[in-house]
Amino acid sequence: VIMDLFKAAGLPDGVINMVTVSGKEISEVVFKDEKFAGLHFTGSTNVFRTLWKGIGNNIEKYKSYPRIVGETGGKDFIVAHKSAVATEVATAISRGAFEYQGQKCSAASRAYIPTNLWGDVKEQIIKDVNSFKMGSPSDTSNFINAVISEKAFDSIASYIDYAKNSDEAEIIVGGNYDKSLGYFIQPTIIVTTNPQFKTMVEEVFGPVMTIYVYNEEKWEETLTLVDKTSEYALTGAILSVDRYAAETACKMLENSAGNFYINDKPTGAVVSQQPFGGARGSGTNDKAGSVLNLLRWVSPRTIKETFVPPTDYRYPFLGE
Protein backbone atom coordinates (compact mmCIF):
# COMPACT_ATOMS: atom_id res chain seq x y z
CA VAL A 1 0.00 0.00 0.00
CA ILE A 2 2.82 2.41 0.88
CA MET A 3 4.53 1.87 -2.47
CA ASP A 4 1.21 2.36 -4.27
CA LEU A 5 0.80 5.69 -2.49
CA PHE A 6 4.29 6.83 -3.49
CA LYS A 7 3.60 5.91 -7.12
CA ALA A 8 0.22 7.66 -7.08
CA ALA A 9 1.95 10.75 -5.71
CA GLY A 10 4.25 10.82 -8.74
CA LEU A 11 7.48 9.38 -7.34
CA PRO A 12 9.53 7.94 -10.25
CA ASP A 13 10.16 4.21 -10.30
CA GLY A 14 13.43 3.18 -8.68
CA VAL A 15 13.78 6.10 -6.27
CA ILE A 16 12.45 3.88 -3.49
CA ASN A 17 12.45 0.10 -3.74
CA MET A 18 10.71 -2.34 -1.44
CA VAL A 19 12.19 -5.81 -1.10
CA THR A 20 10.38 -8.20 1.24
CA VAL A 21 12.89 -10.74 2.44
CA SER A 22 14.38 -11.92 5.72
CA GLY A 23 17.04 -9.72 7.27
CA LYS A 24 19.56 -12.55 7.25
CA GLU A 25 19.13 -13.23 3.53
CA ILE A 26 19.37 -9.62 2.40
CA SER A 27 22.27 -8.76 4.71
CA GLU A 28 24.39 -11.51 3.16
CA VAL A 29 24.04 -9.73 -0.17
CA VAL A 30 23.88 -6.05 0.75
CA PHE A 31 26.63 -6.01 3.38
CA LYS A 32 29.14 -7.46 0.91
CA ASP A 33 28.55 -4.77 -1.72
CA GLU A 34 31.15 -2.00 -1.95
CA LYS A 35 28.37 0.56 -2.52
CA PHE A 36 26.64 -0.18 0.78
CA ALA A 37 26.24 3.23 2.42
CA GLY A 38 23.85 2.97 5.33
CA LEU A 39 21.40 1.04 7.45
CA HIS A 40 18.29 2.40 9.17
CA PHE A 41 16.95 -0.42 11.32
CA THR A 42 13.89 -0.84 13.52
CA GLY A 43 13.65 -4.12 15.40
CA SER A 44 15.16 -6.11 18.23
CA THR A 45 18.37 -5.21 20.01
CA ASN A 46 20.02 -8.57 19.35
CA VAL A 47 19.28 -8.47 15.62
CA PHE A 48 20.66 -4.93 15.37
CA ARG A 49 23.86 -5.97 17.11
CA THR A 50 24.20 -8.89 14.70
CA LEU A 51 23.73 -6.59 11.70
CA TRP A 52 26.29 -4.11 13.07
CA LYS A 53 28.82 -6.94 13.47
CA GLY A 54 28.17 -7.99 9.88
CA ILE A 55 28.87 -4.46 8.66
CA GLY A 56 32.03 -4.28 10.73
CA ASN A 57 33.31 -7.54 9.30
CA ASN A 58 33.07 -6.07 5.79
CA ILE A 59 34.31 -2.55 6.52
CA GLU A 60 37.33 -2.83 4.21
CA LYS A 61 35.07 -3.44 1.20
CA TYR A 62 33.10 -0.21 1.35
CA LYS A 63 33.82 2.98 -0.57
CA SER A 64 32.87 5.01 2.50
CA TYR A 65 31.97 4.39 6.12
CA PRO A 66 28.29 3.34 6.30
CA ARG A 67 25.84 5.37 8.37
CA ILE A 68 24.15 3.14 10.95
CA VAL A 69 20.95 4.15 12.73
CA GLY A 70 18.93 1.83 14.92
CA GLU A 71 15.77 2.02 16.99
CA THR A 72 15.58 -1.21 18.92
CA GLY A 73 14.13 -2.53 22.17
CA GLY A 74 12.86 -0.99 25.35
CA LYS A 75 12.00 -1.82 28.94
CA ASP A 76 10.00 1.31 29.51
CA PHE A 77 9.11 2.48 32.98
CA ILE A 78 6.57 4.38 35.02
CA VAL A 79 7.69 5.73 38.39
CA ALA A 80 5.19 7.32 40.77
CA HIS A 81 6.24 9.71 43.53
CA LYS A 82 4.40 9.66 46.85
CA SER A 83 2.77 12.98 45.89
CA ALA A 84 1.24 11.58 42.68
CA VAL A 85 -2.50 11.16 42.14
CA ALA A 86 -3.45 7.48 42.29
CA THR A 87 -6.02 7.59 39.48
CA GLU A 88 -3.53 9.32 37.19
CA VAL A 89 -0.92 6.66 37.95
CA ALA A 90 -3.39 3.85 37.28
CA THR A 91 -4.48 5.41 34.00
CA ALA A 92 -0.87 5.84 32.87
CA ILE A 93 -0.34 2.13 33.52
CA SER A 94 -3.57 1.01 31.85
CA ARG A 95 -2.95 3.03 28.72
CA GLY A 96 0.83 2.88 28.63
CA ALA A 97 1.10 -0.87 29.12
CA PHE A 98 -1.90 -2.22 27.24
CA GLU A 99 -2.60 -0.05 24.20
CA TYR A 100 -1.77 -2.10 21.09
CA GLN A 101 -1.45 -5.09 23.45
CA GLY A 102 1.89 -3.69 24.61
CA GLN A 103 3.31 -4.49 21.17
CA LYS A 104 5.29 -1.32 20.64
CA CYS A 105 8.79 -0.52 21.75
CA SER A 106 7.59 2.45 23.82
CA ALA A 107 4.98 0.50 25.82
CA ALA A 108 5.34 0.60 29.60
CA SER A 109 6.28 -2.77 31.04
CA ARG A 110 7.63 -2.00 34.53
CA ALA A 111 6.31 0.33 37.21
CA TYR A 112 7.48 1.51 40.60
CA ILE A 113 4.68 2.49 42.97
CA PRO A 114 5.14 3.98 46.48
CA THR A 115 3.61 2.19 49.46
CA ASN A 116 1.27 5.07 50.32
CA LEU A 117 -0.40 4.95 46.88
CA TRP A 118 -0.34 1.24 46.20
CA GLY A 119 -3.74 0.34 47.67
CA ASP A 120 -5.62 2.90 45.57
CA VAL A 121 -3.55 2.27 42.42
CA LYS A 122 -4.04 -1.48 42.72
CA GLU A 123 -7.80 -1.15 43.08
CA GLN A 124 -8.06 1.15 40.05
CA ILE A 125 -5.87 -0.84 37.66
CA ILE A 126 -7.67 -4.08 38.46
CA LYS A 127 -10.94 -2.29 37.76
CA ASP A 128 -9.53 -0.91 34.50
CA VAL A 129 -8.19 -4.23 33.22
CA ASN A 130 -11.40 -6.07 34.05
CA SER A 131 -13.32 -3.48 32.02
CA PHE A 132 -11.23 -3.92 28.86
CA LYS A 133 -13.10 -5.34 25.89
CA MET A 134 -11.13 -7.85 23.86
CA GLY A 135 -11.72 -8.86 20.27
CA SER A 136 -11.23 -7.93 16.63
CA PRO A 137 -9.77 -4.51 15.75
CA SER A 138 -12.63 -4.12 13.29
CA ASP A 139 -14.75 -3.33 16.34
CA THR A 140 -13.28 -0.06 17.60
CA SER A 141 -14.85 -0.53 21.03
CA ASN A 142 -12.33 -3.32 21.70
CA PHE A 143 -9.39 -2.02 23.73
CA ILE A 144 -7.43 -5.29 23.40
CA ASN A 145 -6.82 -7.28 20.21
CA ALA A 146 -4.79 -10.38 19.41
CA VAL A 147 -1.00 -10.32 19.47
CA ILE A 148 0.75 -10.40 16.12
CA SER A 149 1.82 -14.04 15.73
CA GLU A 150 2.01 -17.46 17.33
CA LYS A 151 5.70 -16.94 18.02
CA ALA A 152 4.90 -13.75 19.94
CA PHE A 153 2.02 -15.48 21.72
CA ASP A 154 4.22 -18.34 22.91
CA SER A 155 6.96 -15.99 24.09
CA ILE A 156 4.58 -13.78 26.08
CA ALA A 157 2.80 -16.80 27.56
CA SER A 158 6.14 -18.17 28.76
CA TYR A 159 6.75 -15.00 30.79
CA ILE A 160 3.29 -15.28 32.36
CA ASP A 161 3.93 -18.92 33.24
CA TYR A 162 7.29 -17.97 34.75
CA ALA A 163 5.56 -15.49 37.05
CA LYS A 164 2.87 -18.02 37.99
CA ASN A 165 5.54 -20.47 39.12
CA SER A 166 7.69 -17.98 41.04
CA ASP A 167 7.68 -17.33 44.78
CA GLU A 168 8.76 -13.75 44.07
CA ALA A 169 5.72 -12.75 42.05
CA GLU A 170 1.93 -12.59 42.18
CA ILE A 171 -0.47 -12.04 39.29
CA ILE A 172 -3.16 -9.67 40.57
CA VAL A 173 -5.20 -9.53 37.38
CA GLY A 174 -5.14 -11.37 34.06
CA GLY A 175 -2.79 -14.25 33.49
CA ASN A 176 -4.89 -16.20 31.00
CA TYR A 177 -4.25 -16.79 27.30
CA ASP A 178 -5.90 -18.72 24.48
CA LYS A 179 -4.97 -19.21 20.82
CA SER A 180 -7.88 -21.39 19.76
CA LEU A 181 -9.61 -18.48 17.98
CA GLY A 182 -6.71 -16.08 17.58
CA TYR A 183 -3.62 -15.20 19.55
CA PHE A 184 -5.37 -13.58 22.51
CA ILE A 185 -3.58 -12.85 25.77
CA GLN A 186 -5.39 -11.34 28.72
CA PRO A 187 -3.75 -8.12 29.95
CA THR A 188 -1.66 -9.23 32.90
CA ILE A 189 -0.28 -7.36 35.90
CA ILE A 190 2.44 -8.98 37.97
CA VAL A 191 3.54 -7.67 41.37
CA THR A 192 7.01 -8.70 42.47
CA THR A 193 9.06 -8.37 45.64
CA ASN A 194 12.27 -8.54 43.61
CA PRO A 195 13.15 -5.38 41.65
CA GLN A 196 15.43 -7.52 39.46
CA PHE A 197 12.71 -10.04 38.65
CA LYS A 198 12.85 -11.44 35.12
CA THR A 199 9.84 -9.48 33.86
CA MET A 200 11.23 -6.27 35.39
CA VAL A 201 14.41 -6.62 33.35
CA GLU A 202 13.66 -8.36 30.04
CA GLU A 203 11.61 -6.98 27.16
CA VAL A 204 8.33 -8.93 26.94
CA PHE A 205 6.71 -7.00 24.06
CA GLY A 206 3.19 -7.88 25.03
CA PRO A 207 0.35 -7.03 27.44
CA VAL A 208 2.31 -7.74 30.61
CA MET A 209 3.10 -5.12 33.26
CA THR A 210 5.27 -5.85 36.29
CA ILE A 211 5.06 -3.65 39.39
CA TYR A 212 7.49 -3.21 42.26
CA VAL A 213 6.14 -1.47 45.37
CA TYR A 214 8.82 0.66 47.03
CA ASN A 215 9.17 2.47 50.34
CA GLU A 216 7.55 5.87 49.79
CA GLU A 217 10.45 7.63 51.53
CA LYS A 218 13.09 6.18 49.19
CA TRP A 219 12.51 8.29 46.07
CA GLU A 220 16.11 8.85 45.01
CA GLU A 221 17.13 5.28 45.84
CA THR A 222 14.28 4.06 43.64
CA LEU A 223 15.34 6.34 40.78
CA THR A 224 18.83 4.84 40.98
CA LEU A 225 17.24 1.39 40.85
CA VAL A 226 15.22 2.35 37.77
CA ASP A 227 18.36 3.56 36.00
CA LYS A 228 20.39 0.44 36.73
CA THR A 229 17.79 -2.29 36.24
CA SER A 230 17.60 -2.47 32.45
CA GLU A 231 20.04 -2.31 29.55
CA TYR A 232 17.50 -0.22 27.63
CA ALA A 233 16.89 3.53 27.59
CA LEU A 234 14.00 4.22 25.25
CA THR A 235 11.04 5.77 27.10
CA GLY A 236 10.02 6.40 30.67
CA ALA A 237 7.60 8.43 32.74
CA ILE A 238 7.40 9.85 36.23
CA LEU A 239 4.26 11.09 37.95
CA SER A 240 4.58 13.66 40.71
CA VAL A 241 2.74 16.68 42.07
CA ASP A 242 5.92 17.67 43.92
CA ARG A 243 7.87 19.78 41.41
CA TYR A 244 11.22 19.31 43.16
CA ALA A 245 10.77 15.52 43.05
CA ALA A 246 9.98 15.72 39.33
CA GLU A 247 13.08 17.81 38.61
CA THR A 248 15.20 15.41 40.66
CA ALA A 249 13.90 12.50 38.60
CA CYS A 250 14.48 14.37 35.34
CA LYS A 251 18.13 14.80 36.27
CA MET A 252 18.78 11.36 37.76
CA LEU A 253 17.13 9.59 34.83
CA GLU A 254 18.68 11.70 32.07
CA ASN A 255 20.40 8.65 30.58
CA SER A 256 17.55 6.23 31.27
CA ALA A 257 15.11 7.32 28.56
CA GLY A 258 15.49 9.16 25.26
CA ASN A 259 11.82 10.13 25.48
CA PHE A 260 10.94 11.18 29.03
CA TYR A 261 7.43 12.02 30.16
CA ILE A 262 6.29 13.93 33.23
CA ASN A 263 2.76 13.18 34.48
CA ASP A 264 1.86 11.13 31.41
CA LYS A 265 2.23 7.61 30.03
CA PRO A 266 5.63 6.85 28.41
CA THR A 267 4.28 6.24 24.92
CA GLY A 268 2.47 7.95 22.06
CA ALA A 269 5.14 10.33 20.71
CA VAL A 270 3.74 12.57 17.98
CA VAL A 271 5.80 12.59 14.77
CA SER A 272 7.40 16.00 14.08
CA GLN A 273 6.50 17.18 17.58
CA GLN A 274 8.26 14.66 19.82
CA PRO A 275 11.43 13.30 18.14
CA PHE A 276 11.66 9.63 19.08
CA GLY A 277 14.56 7.41 20.08
CA GLY A 278 16.76 6.23 22.93
CA ALA A 279 20.32 5.17 23.61
CA ARG A 280 22.01 2.29 25.44
CA GLY A 281 20.47 -1.00 24.28
CA SER A 282 17.56 0.89 22.71
CA GLY A 283 19.46 2.22 19.72
CA THR A 284 21.50 5.12 18.42
CA ASN A 285 19.05 7.83 19.58
CA ASP A 286 18.95 9.57 16.21
CA LYS A 287 15.41 10.83 16.81
CA ALA A 288 13.08 9.56 14.12
CA GLY A 289 10.46 12.09 13.09
CA SER A 290 12.83 15.05 13.23
CA VAL A 291 15.46 16.88 11.22
CA LEU A 292 18.07 15.30 13.51
CA ASN A 293 17.45 11.94 11.85
CA LEU A 294 17.46 13.37 8.32
CA LEU A 295 20.85 14.98 8.92
CA ARG A 296 22.35 11.53 9.51
CA TRP A 297 21.76 10.73 5.83
CA VAL A 298 23.34 13.75 4.17
CA SER A 299 27.01 14.20 3.33
CA PRO A 300 27.95 17.87 3.83
CA ARG A 301 30.39 19.43 1.40
CA THR A 302 32.26 22.66 2.12
CA ILE A 303 33.28 24.85 -0.85
CA LYS A 304 35.58 27.87 -0.63
CA GLU A 305 36.13 30.27 -3.54
CA THR A 306 38.82 32.96 -3.34
CA PHE A 307 38.15 36.04 -5.47
CA VAL A 308 41.60 37.62 -4.95
CA PRO A 309 44.14 34.79 -4.98
CA PRO A 310 47.53 35.59 -3.34
CA THR A 311 50.56 36.06 -5.58
CA ASP A 312 53.28 35.88 -2.91
CA TYR A 313 53.79 33.08 -0.41
CA ARG A 314 55.06 35.52 2.25
CA TYR A 315 52.60 36.59 4.94
CA PRO A 316 52.85 40.23 6.16
CA PHE A 317 54.23 39.18 9.56
CA LEU A 318 57.25 37.61 7.85
CA GLY A 319 58.55 41.02 6.84
CA GLU A 320 60.61 41.82 3.73
Region annotations inferred by a language model:
Residues 1-27, 59:
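PLP-dependent aminotransferase-like
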Residues 207:
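Glycine-rich nucleotide-phosphate-binding loops and adjacent flexible coil segments
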Residues 8-10, 15, 32-34, 38, ...:
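ALDH superfamily catalytic-core signature
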Residues 23-29, 43-48:
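Beta-loop-alpha module in the N-terminal Rossmann-like domain of NAD(P)-dependent dehydrogenases
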Residues 82, 212-216, 239:
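A structural signal for short, well-ordered beta-strand elements
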Residues 22, 42, 211, 239-240, ...:
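Conserved residues at the C-terminal ends of beta-strands
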Residues 15-18, 38-41, 235-238:
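Short catalytic-loop micro-motif centered on adjacent basic/acidic residues
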Residues 176-188, 219-307:
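C-terminal core of ALDH-fold dehydrogenases
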